[in-house]
C-alpha cells in the first residue's frame, strides 16, 4: 500500500486489548475505564481484517495492547497469525509486552514463529518500577525476559525516558542489556491522553537523557533498520545496540511505514493524529467491499507527519486518546 506521500505501508500494529495488569504513569490513568467486551474485535474479526491487509501488502504485524497477553485465549490469535508466518504471507510477527506473563507464554510465541519481542521496562530498581507501573512486580518481568531468551526469542527492551524519574536508571539498564544479549531502545514521552501537562514536565530529550552514557562510551551510527522508527547506534566497549525513538526532538515521519488497528476496530494512520476510519461497523454489517473502500480511504488520510508540536502549542488540539487505547 502506498500512501499520498509515496511511503510504502507494510507494517500493521494490532492492539488486541486496552486492558493491562499495570498502570504505567505515562500510559494511562490509575482509574482507567476500559471498553466493554462487546466493543472489542473478536479474533475471527481480527483475522478477517488481517487477511485483507495482507492482500493489500502488509508484511509485518506487531501485537500490542494494553498488555496483549492478558486477553483471554490470546493463544488462539497468536497461533492463527503464526500460520501466516509459516506460509510466507507475513515476513514478521512480533509483540510488545510488559513481560509479566512472558514466562508463561514464551514457548507458545516461539512455536508460532515469533522471533522477537519488545519488553517495556523503564528501570531495574524494584521500588522505582513499582512506582512507575503503579504496583507491577519487577521479578516477574525479569523472569519473562529470561524465559524468552531461553526459547531463542530475541528481546529488545523499550525504556521510556522520564525526567527526574529514571535518568539514573540508564547506566544499569545498558549494562543489563549488554550482559544478557538484549537490544535497548530509548523512547521520548509523547503528549497523549489526560495529564498531558504533567507529561510535558516529565519530558526529556534523548540527547540529554543519554548524556551519562555518552560520557563513558563512544557511539557509532549503525545502518541497521527495524520495522520501526528507531535510529540505531553501537555503544563501544559494551557491545550494545542502542535504538533512539525521538518523536519530539528528531522527527522521523518521512519514513513511516505503519498503520494501527485499535481493539475496537478503528484504523489510525498516525499515533499523533485523530484521523481514523471505523472498520468494525463494516465488518459487522457484512459488507466486504466497504472494508476495502475504507482501507483506501485510510491511506488517503495518513498525514505527512505527526502533529505533536501543534498540539502542545494549542491545548484545544491535544489528543484525548491514551497510549493503551491506540497500541503505541
Question: How would you describe each model-predicted region?
Answer:
Residues 40-63, 70-187:
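Radical SAM/AdoMet-radical enzyme domain recognition
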Residues 34, 66-68:
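Glycine-rich, proline-tolerant flexible connector loops at the mouths of alpha/beta enzymes
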Residues 32-36, 125-132, 193-197, 278-279:
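A short acidic, helix-capping loop that chelates divalent metal ions and anchors anionic groups
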Residues 1-11, 179, 189-328:
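Auxiliary Fe-S-binding modules of radical SAM enzymes
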Residues 4-44:
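Canonical Radical SAM [4Fe-4S] cluster-binding loop centered on the CxxxCxxC motif
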Residues 16, 184, 265:
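Residue-level signature of catalytic and energy-coupling elements of molecular machines
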Residues 22, 126-127, 251, 277:
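Glycine-centered loop/turn positions within well-structured domains
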Residues 68, 160-164, 191, 196-199:
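Short histidine/acidic/glycine/proline-rich micro-motifs that form metal-
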Amino acid at each position: 500500500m502506498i500512501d499520498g506521500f509515496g511511503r510504502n505501508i507494510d507494517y500493521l500494529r494490532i492492539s488486541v486489548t486496552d486492558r493491562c495488569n499495570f498502570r504505567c504513569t505515562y500510559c494511562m490513568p490509575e482509574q482507567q475505564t476500559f471498553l466493554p467486551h462487546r466493543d472489542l474485535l473478536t479474533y475471527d474479526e481480527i483475522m478477517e481484517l488481517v487477511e485483507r491487509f495482507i492482500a493489500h501488502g502488509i508484511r509485518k504485524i506487531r501485537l500490542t495492547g494494553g498488555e496483549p497477553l492478558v486477553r483471554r485465549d490470546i493463544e488462539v490469535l497468536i497461533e492463527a497469525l503464526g500460520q501466516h508466518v509459516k506460509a510466507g504471507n507475513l515476513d514478521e510477527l512480533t509483540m510488545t509486552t510488559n513481560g509479566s506473563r512472558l514466562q508463561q507464554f514464551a514457548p507458545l510465541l516461539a512455536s508460532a514463529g515469533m522471533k522477537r519481542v519488545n519488553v517495556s521496562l523503564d528501570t531495574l530498581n524494584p521500588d522505582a518500577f513499582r512506582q512507575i507501573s503503579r504496583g507491577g512486580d519487577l521479578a516477574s518481568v525479569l523472569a519473562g525476559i529470561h524465559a524468552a531468551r531461553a526459547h531463542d526469542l530475541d528481546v529488545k527492551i523499550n525504556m521510556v525516558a522520564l525526567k527526574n524519574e529514571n535518568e539514573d536508571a540508564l547506566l544499569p539498564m545498558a549494562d543489563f542489556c549488554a550482559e544478557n544479549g538484549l537490544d535497548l531502545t530509548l523512547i521520548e514521552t509523547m503528549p497523549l491522553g489526560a495529564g498531558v501537562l504533567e507529561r510535558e514536565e516529565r519530558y526529556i530529550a534523548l540527547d540529554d537523557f543519554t548524556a551519562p552514557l555518552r560520557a563513558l562510551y563512544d557511539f557509532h551510527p549503525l545502518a541497521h533498520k527495524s520495522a520501526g522508527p528507531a535510529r540505531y547506534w553501537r555503544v563501544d566497549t559494551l557491545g550494545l545496540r542502542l535504538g533512539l525513538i525521538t518523536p519530539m526532538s528528531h522527527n522521523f515521519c518521512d519514513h513511516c511505514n505503519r498503520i494501527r488497528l485499535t481493539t475496537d476496530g478503528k484504523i489510525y494512520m498516525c499515533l499523533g493524529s485523530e484521523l481514523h476510519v471505523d472498520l468494525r461497523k463494516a465488518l459487522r454489517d457484512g459488507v466486504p467491499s466497504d472494508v476495502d473502500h475504507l482501507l483506501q480511504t485510510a491511506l488517503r488520510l495518513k498525514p505527512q507527519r505527526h502533529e505533536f508540536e501543534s498540539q502542545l502549542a494549542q491545548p484545544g488540539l491535544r489528543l484525548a486518546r491514551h497510549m493503551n487505547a491506540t497500541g503505541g
